[in-house]
């Protein structure tokens, strides 16, 4: 048995989809365990770019099982659209499995998400307005509708009527907005349920059986550790647990069955939406990194905020997610910069701190303490081993590993599969 979890170690958009796709070549089952279609990952295969939001990256391997676990919140409309997109691209989805325990995102969740965000004014969180938060709220309040409910016409109708009555009171009384009618949702979403019915099953059984049979299972996280509702920059976070511990809850697999945790990061830092970002760049260097790195959100299209590599963030991610291996992406984006900076600690009111504060007020006062390193001018997109990197690039990679305290198992010098270089196989024995 070998199981590997892939987690983002920053604020999402670290290149998890690419690394998951790369590691999927040696996996037999690939599973997502949290999040929804607010997550976006881009995969490049033979020069063709594919953008997915819900379906695991492993779908491109027809002989492998791709699982949407119970911890994922599923928008049936988005899922059907994504399935059709794959079919139109010549990709089969016969290997897809969807948990019958996963919760469903419905139009009232999306509307509530938008209204809540608008009402916050300057205190907005920066939500993608996909209904993710309200769906998880309903789940916690025990009024959510699950995939199993969606497939049963009578149960779906009953629970939808009950939920709409409550949500419409909220829309009309609190937000002075128009209600959503039952007929606007019911037939359309029941039909979506019937379209995905053939994929629905108890995915916990599939995953545990695979592990018990000694198969290789890969768990794919969405977003990143710094967006985790418990360990991230609360309240500027997502509504689920991207940390590796989220696997046990969101997939129905016990913690004793997790072998390795691969933390994915960029050679710099990026963030979409609001919230603290100590190493953020507001100058021409930041603009250059954004343009060369194509730092625009897969889901929203919004320009991402960019900054220098932050080892304080990375050490926090290592601790709370139990990271055993590091996958370092986008090193090539830094080519051509004369001097590079790595944040090694923060200055908080004159005191050096090495940990990431929970207090947003303290974070606002934190100033990054930088270590400068020489850059490199060479084009490294064709590099296929660590030894081929310029000396300055090698030193930069090694310094990141030292500061984070985790060995690097892969590094990437571009978006293609062939541009991902293995230093150590995570599929080897413990």
Swiss-Prot record:
Reaction equations catalysed: IMP + L-aspartate + GTP = N(6)-(1,2-dicarboxyethyl)-AMP + GDP + phosphate + 2 H(+)
EC supergroup of this enzyme: ligase
UniProt-annotated binding residues for Mg(2+): 13, 40
GO molecular function: adenylosuccinate synthase activity; GTP binding; magnesium ion binding
An example Gene Ontology biological process: IMP metabolic process
Role this protein plays: Plays an important role in the de novo pathway of purine nucleotide biosynthesis. Catalyzes the first committed step in the biosynthesis of AMP from IMP.
Protein species of origin: Streptococcus suis (strain 98HAH33)
Textual note on the cofactor: Binds 1 Mg(2+) ion per subunit.
Residue intervals passing through the bilayer: none
Subunit structure: Homodimer.
UniProt family annotation: Belongs to the adenylosuccinate synthetase family.
Pathway: Purine metabolism; AMP biosynthesis via de novo pathway; AMP from IMP: step 1/2
Location, primary (coarse class): cytoplasm
Name of this chain's protein: Adenylosuccinate synthetase
Active-site residues, as the UniProt record annotates them: 13 (proton acceptor), 41 (proton donor)
GO cellular component, one term: cytoplasm
Keywords carried by this UniProt record: Cytoplasm, GTP-binding, Ligase, Magnesium, Metal-binding, Nucleotide-binding, Purine biosynthesis
The protein's required cofactors: Mg(2+)
Localization per record: Cytoplasm
The enzyme's E.C. designation: 6.3.4.4
PROSITE patterns: ADENYLOSUCCIN_SYN_1, ADENYLOSUCCIN_SYN_2
Protein residues bound to GTP: 12-18, 40-42, 304, 330-332, 412-414
